[in-house]
Amino acid sequence: MINMKIARLVRDGHETYGLIRDGKVATKDNMVNQTGVPLPFSIMDFLFEGWYDEIKDRIISTSFQDKLETFSILNPLPNPSKIICLTFNYPKHAKEQNYESTKEPVIFIKPRTTLCGTNSEIRCPNFVKQLDYEIEL
């Protein structure tokens, strides 16, 4: 099995999605050209309507034509309804903060507006006294 990641990407103002492997990207258009499968425009349709399963065995190494560093990685999903988070999934960090681990997971939600892409700015209002970047991963 080949190890690949799925991502939303933008380059030169053009948004797309693609598969990432070894620092190279197979964009939606690359995959369509290589496989002949008419992939959907939306990453949501690609993920949740079985398209990945349709093409995963057809993807060949020549589909990965573009260097990842030529793209900006966007937040994973456009307009999710909510983000469900789990606290203390980093036990070492909890210990550093002098928090006692709980036996049960602590779950909380965040608004969808808190999502951002890789290397994007994390906005912090002036009234925030402590921003825990490890919680913001």
PLM feature spans:
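Glycine-enriched loop-and-adjacent helix/strand subsegments that border the catalytic/binding cleft
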Residues: 80-137
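N-terminal non-catalytic cap/leader segment that marks the start of a structured domain
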Residues: 2-105
